[in-house]
Every structure is written in structure tokens, then in C-alpha cells.
Amino acid sequence: MTSRRPLKDHLFNHLFRYHYPSWDQILQELDTLSVATLNPDCHVPALNVEKTLYLAKTIQILVQHRQSEPYLVPAARANLAYSLQQLYKLGNDKIRGVINGMLPLVDAGCIGFERELIKGLPRVLTLQYPHTAPLESEPPTADCTEWCLSHFVGASGRLRSEVRDILTTHNGTCAPSFQWMASVVKKFFLVETVIYEDFQDTDFNVQLNLCFFWTAVVQMYQRCIYEQKLVHIISTSLTLLKSTARSFFAWYDLYRPNLGSAALVKYTEHLIRALTPDCSDVELGELCSHLHHCKHALFSIQ
């Protein structure tokens, strides 16, 4: 059974861990909210204000995610280029030749550069470890998580499991943030002292595995951007915010309780009506402040 809790206890963990959260996650968080009012008649309107405030804060964070969205693929691409450069230093002449065909495309961010990686990285693997069986170069779908994992070398089952979990969270309905992925990425590096009998070049393994990982990450983010996941979830959240707020304002217009300033309440209603899916986090920040006032005023009514 889900525990109910006040908004102040919410850490918005789903928004820290996911650049693209799922709608179900937001609804589950919303359903855990509760309030305690002195006047029982104020309980439902206060809860509606609490939910409106939660949705406003959620949208504010999602808008910030939208602002940083253009940097996701370039950041993953830069990490990919770094690992390719390290492989170039560690590999033999044949491996360098393959990397020379991929690295300029990654550096330039050429359209479709990830397709060349999907073809070229398995070649790097077999050139370094000729005893590895040839694997299917093309992932079966746009999601290349399993392709990525099938090419890992010298990686523990636990690391593979964590990578699968982070790249396929909630059956692909959401995508992780860079901050959350960092907690997994560091584990690639923390195996530098582990030697595998069949894959003995640990330094090489670390960088090659990271190349496979960042290729999958690029594919994941490109899919989210193409599907406009943030646009859809912001619009859906905003629709629910306005609907929830309307219930509160209808109650306020009917009973006219003293919330400190009737003009401020009406101004808050105006701000909510004016919100659009293209709103900024500045507008939402102001709205959150006024909703806090309404909430605490409702709490004090006897």
C-alpha cells in the first residue's frame, strides 16, 4: 500500500533520475499527497492546491529538462569520442584504421554517425580478441540495448544488469538523466584491476564497453527527442494542473474564504489560465510561490 505524505517530503526522485519520466510515475507521486487542515471543510480544496503545486513544480523541472535537451546527444557524443580516442591509443594498427573511419563522424556529429559505430565497434572487438564469435552487427530494433550488452567484454553480470535496467527503465517509457547514468558509468572504470582470462586487456575493455554504452545512449536520447516525449508529458501535466486548479477556484468562488487577499487568489487563477506548454520555469516559479500562500492560508482557517 502506497503511503501518503505531504509535498514537503517529496524529493522528486523520478525527476532527478529521469530526464524523461513516465506519466505513470508522476501520477503515482501525485496519489501519495496528503494534507492536514484545521477545518475539515478545507481539506479537499487544500489537497487540490497541494496537487496543483506539485504539478507546477513538476512542470517547472520538466521545462528545465526541455531547455537542456539539446545538449544530451552532444554530451553523449563527446564521451563517445573520448573513449574512441583512448581505444586508438591502446589498439593495434588495424584497430586504428577502423577508428579512423568512425571518429571524424562522431567529432562532427554527422547524421547517422551511430550507424557507423554499430558496424565498426564489433569489428574493433574481433580485431582485439580474434577468438570472439562474430555477432550480428545490426540491432534488431531502434533500441540497441541488447546489442550493446551482447558486445560487452570483461563485464560482470551485475554491471550488465545495471546497464540493462538504466537503458530500459519502465519498458522504455522513460529515459535516465545524465546524473543517474554517471552512477553506472563510474562502475565501468572501477574494474581496472580485474583481469579476465579471455579478455586480458582491462584498459581496452573499459573504453570499448563505454563505446558500446554511449552508442546505446545516443540512440535512446535521439528516439526520445524524435518522439517529443517532453512536449507530450509537459502538455499532459499542464492539462491536469489546470483541471485540478479549477476545482479549487470553483470552491473559492462559492464560499469566499479569507485567504489573506482575494485579489491575489484571482491573480493566481489568471497565471494558471495563462500557462501554455511553451511556458518558462520563471512563470512557474512565480506560480509556485502564490500557490504556497494559498495552501498555508487554507491550513490556518479554523
Swiss-Prot record:
UniProt record, GO biological process: release from viral latency
Tagged with keyword Transit peptide: no
UniProt keyword list: Viral latency, Viral reactivation from latency
Pfam assignment, any one: Herpes_BBRF1
InterPro entries for the chain: Herpes_BBRF1
Function statement: Plays a role in the activation the host JNK/p38 pathways necessary for KSHV reactivation from latency and for viral replication. Induces transcriptional activation through host JUN of several ORF50-responsive promoters.
Similarity comment text for this entry: Belongs to the herpesviridae BBRF1 family.
The name this protein goes by in its record: Protein ORF49
Species classification: Viruses, Duplodnaviria, Heunggongvirae, Peploviricota, Herviviricetes
